[in-house]
């Protein structure tokens, strides 16, 4: 018994692009209250989002028979998830000084504004992702999955 792969683009479903719905929603809610003033803080939350993803199906491992999973490669979720992950990476863009050990007042003000802008961007992307998940976008269950990629059983003997 296995999935009947008929198109090369079907291999994407076997990658680590799935998340459990409740932990994903909880992570969004939790992340909205985080402080993003340091790159280490942004990296931590980015890693928490990345850690939610896993593989749940393989060519010979069937989609779970109960519940839904978030498919982050869905047309609605993918651009939001990618934008969120990109918004966390502000390394080397926050403070750019001519002499790193003694930034000028304007460089410090500029860096502060960039941190504030990064925080707004991160929270905005999290809220957009949370809204779409709350509206039921990006979820798949076994029936929906197997409409795309049929499960074949061995012939009866």
Curated annotation (Swiss-Prot):
It comes from Ribgrass mosaic virus (strain Hr) (RMV). This is Capsid protein. One of its GO terms (molecular function) is structural molecule activity. It comes from the Viruses. InterPro entries: TMV-like_coat, TMV-like_coat_sf. The modification N-acetylserine is found at residue 2. GO terms for cellular component: helical viral capsid. Capsid protein self-assembles to form rod-shaped virions about 18 nm in diameter with a central canal enclosing the viral genomic RNA. Belongs to the virgaviridae capsid protein family. Keywords: Acetylation, Capsid protein, Helical capsid protein, Virion. It is found in: Virion. It holds the Pfam family TMV_coat. Disulfide bonds: none annotated.
């Amino acid at each position: 018994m296995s999935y009947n792969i008929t198109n090369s683009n079907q291999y994407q479903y076997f990658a680590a692009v799935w998340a459990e719905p409740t932990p994903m929603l909880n992570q969004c809610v939790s992340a909205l209250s985080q402080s993003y003033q340091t790159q280490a803080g942004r990296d931590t939350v980015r890693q928490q989002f990345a850690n939610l993803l896993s593989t749940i199906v393989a060519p010979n491992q069937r989609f779970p028979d109960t519940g839904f999973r978030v498919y982050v490669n869905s047309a609605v979720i993918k651009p939001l998830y990618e934008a969120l992950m990109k918004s966390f990476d502000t390394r080397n863009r926050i403070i750019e000084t001519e002499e790193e050990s003694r930034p000028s007042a304007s460089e410090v003000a500029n860096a502060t504004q960039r941190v504030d802008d990064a925080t707004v961007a991160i929270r905005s992307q999290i809220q957009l992702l949370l809204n779409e998940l709350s509206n039921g976008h990006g979820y798949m269950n076994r029936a929906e999955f197997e409409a795309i990629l049929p499960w074949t059983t061995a012939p009866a003997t």
